[in-house]
């Protein structure tokens, strides 16, 4: 059987289901594939394989489906810990999420935690599926639960009043029964996702950024830095900045090479060498980034949301305390930093997810949403994401 060709004609969006345990995330995922993709049964999704991201093992199920206007890649995680790890490592980047809430229970602790995490790690949009409405006879109760969900979303800076909330039963949709709360609710949900979650800007349309992996000096030509273009486009003749670790420098790209061939441009996804005018071999190093002037600034102090590995995952065997000083691995390099814990937090145990403040000994080109690994002597002991830059 030949592999199906991936049709690039429709815009592509990454989404996922989030919410409290047993509220129906996986059943809903299966139901969506029934009407919009190749049907995946519940246990095909629930038995998600383990994968590694930034040294952390995560179980995640990936399904894909499409509506008339878009192609979707959708992630669903079997366990709460997998969600936390997934959202923090960005293993499955989400452009938007479907928050699943059981109408009979209303918002529960993990509902709140997933919304908070979504806010911290930069999931920009959410749509709500109020599941199991067949178990609630009282219309007023449904109204109350809906109000509660909207208030909860608003309390985490999501536009609670505007977010679409679709009522239905994922189980009826799966079984093909009670179409008014089954199939119709799934179609209404995907219509809402199509309309409410915007298509993200493609990587090539964003401002240029390339983490520097290596530096070479070519006699008679100057200094070449190599790396993989993370986003945007670089053209020969462009003015660019070198940001991070040292003072920011501005230079001009005088050449772009790929596989030892000269090109006039490099774009997102390309592994290139960029020739820099007037920069000597000692003037630039791994861990800095090349970027469009003014697009990214260097910072040393930030708030972060992190997951600390368990002993079984290869992490620390003991907790850490305030003023913990590990290395923070950003893009291509380690920088030492000091951790300040939130008031009232005495220590952090392996397996915790936690918010804290970090001060690095050298500045790094940084934006909200940037991912990092926490390392001790080259061994990964955690993963995190910048939730807010302080200075």
Curated annotation (Swiss-Prot):
Domain (tr-type G): residue spans on this chain: 10-201
The organism's place on the tree of life at top rank: Bacteria
Keyword Protein biosynthesis: yes
Molecular functions (GO terms): GTP binding; GTPase activity; guanosine tetraphosphate binding; translation elongation factor activity
EC class of the enzyme, as a word: hydrolase
E.C. designation(s): 3.6.5.3
Pfam families: GTP_EFTU (PF00009), GTP_EFTU_D2 (PF03144), GTP_EFTU_D3 (PF03143)
Binding-site positions, GTP: 19-26, 76-80, 131-134
Region (G1): 19-26
Primary subcellular site in the record, as a coarse category: cytoplasm
Catalytically driven reaction(s): GTP + H2O = GDP + phosphate + H(+)
G5: annotated span: 169-171
Compartment list: Cytoplasm
Keywords tagged on the record: Cytoplasm, Elongation factor, GTP-binding, Hydrolase, Magnesium, Metal-binding, Nucleotide-binding, Protein biosynthesis
Positions of region (G2): 55-59
UniProt cross-references to HAMAP family, sorted A to Z: EF_Tu_B
Record's function text: GTP hydrolase that promotes the GTP-dependent binding of aminoacyl-tRNA to the A-site of ribosomes during protein biosynthesis.
Family label: Belongs to the TRAFAC class translation factor GTPase superfamily. Classic translation factor GTPase family. EF-Tu/EF-1A subfamily.
Protein name per its UniProtKB record: Elongation factor Tu
Annotated organism of origin: Ruegeria pomeroyi (strain ATCC 700808 / DSM 15171 / DSS-3) (Silicibacter pomeroyi)
Lineage: Bacteria, Pseudomonadati, Pseudomonadota, Alphaproteobacteria, Rhodobacterales
């Amino acid at each position: 059987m030949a592999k199906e060709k991936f049709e690039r004609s429709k815009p592509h969006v990454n989404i996922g289901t989030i919410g409290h345990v047993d509220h129906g995330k996986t059943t809903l995922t299966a139901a969506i594939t029934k009407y919009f993709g190749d049907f995946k049964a519940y246990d095909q999704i629930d038995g998600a394989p383990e994968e590694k991201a930034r040294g952390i093992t995560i179980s995640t199920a990936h399904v894909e489906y499409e509506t008339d206007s878009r192609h979707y890649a959708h992630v669903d995680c079997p366990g709460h810990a997998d969600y936390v790890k997934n959202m923090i490592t960005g293993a499955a980047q989400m452009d938007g999420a479907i928050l699943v809430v059981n109408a009979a229970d209303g918002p529960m602790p993990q509902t709140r935690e997933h919304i908070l995490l979504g806010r911290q790690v930069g999931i920009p949009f959410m749509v709500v599926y109020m599941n199991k409405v067949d178990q609630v006879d009282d219309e007023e109760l449904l109204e109350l639960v809906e109000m509660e969900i909207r208030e909860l979303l608003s309390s985490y800076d999501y536009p609670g009043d505007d977010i679409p909330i679709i009522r239905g039963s994922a189980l009826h949709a799966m079984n093909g029964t009670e179409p008014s709360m089954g199939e119709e609710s799934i179609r209404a949900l995907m219509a809402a996702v199509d309309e409410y979650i915007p298509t993200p800007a493609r990587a090539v349309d964003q401002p240029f950024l390339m983490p520097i992996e290596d530096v070479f000096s070519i006699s008679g030509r100057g200094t070449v830095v190599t790396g993989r273009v993370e986003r945007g486009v670089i053209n020969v003749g462009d003015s660019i900045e070198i940001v991070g670790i040292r003072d920011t420098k501005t230079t001009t790209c005088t050449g772009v090479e790929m596989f030892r061939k000269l090109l006039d441009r490099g774009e997102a996804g390309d592994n290139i060498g960029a020739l820099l005018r007037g920069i000597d071999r000692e003037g630039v190093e791994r861990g800095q980034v090349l970027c469009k002037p003014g697009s990214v600034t260097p910072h040393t102090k930030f708030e972060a949301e992190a997951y600390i590995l368990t002993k079984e995952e290869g992490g620390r065997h003991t907790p850490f305390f305030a003023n913990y000083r590990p290395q923070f691995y950003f893009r291509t390099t380690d920088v030492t930093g000091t951790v300040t814990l939130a008031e009232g937090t005495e220590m952090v145990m392996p397996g915790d997810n936690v918010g804290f403040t970090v001060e690095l000994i050298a500045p790094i080109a940084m934006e909200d949403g940037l991912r990092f690994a926490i390392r001790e002597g080259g061994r990964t002991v955690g993963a995190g994401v910048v939730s807010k830059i302080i200075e």
